[in-house]
Amino acid sequence: MENPEQYFELVQERPDLFANPSGAIITILLGQEEIAQAETSMQEALSAQGVTQEKAREWAQVGVAYHDQYLLVLRDAVRFPDGAIGSYIRLVAPREQTPGVVILPIYQGQILLLRHFRHATRSWHLEIPRGFGWPGCTSEESARRELVEELGAEPLRLVPLGQIHPNTGITAECDELFYAEVATYGTPEKREAIGEILPTPLSLFERLIRENTITDGFTLAAYARARARGLL
């Protein structure tokens, strides 16, 4: 196992991360024998794919694969729906925290898009404000703070649009969507890497979606939810 003490501390401190709810068909295994079996099975599978023995051993280890203030990567021993035992990797929040927030801001009937440089893709994106949840804050309070940071704006109206799980195949991340109406907007904080704020009519916004110019999943989700609620 990789970092077994840290892994089993998590099992005790955050049992919800390791729950097997009724009807779960991918089952987390916590017994030592089952974990050893999962590691052996995965190592053999990786070797069969041409992975070196050293890497196969490393990539098959169950436990905490990586941990910092932003990310916690777990590799769990699991039983798959066909009965096979192996391992499965996932990203979870490093601590219990307020969900992230995503805000669709409306100014004088137009959507405020940000031209935002993102390190992960090394490119510019058209997207709406979003960010981590603030410790000790409600989601609504986090949304208000995010609008101040990225738009220099205070919302006149803030409407919850529900939750989104952006990538259920790899991460447990869950974020809260909001619709916001603002009377004014200003200048984003410099550290936010925002090039400009673009008031965008709905017709143009939808054309940017059709033309594959807007590709940010959070932006698309908030738009779809607001449309379905009759807010746009």
Positions of the model-derived regions?
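Nudix hydrolase/Nudix homology domain
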Residues: 1-41, 120-124, 169-170, 175, ...
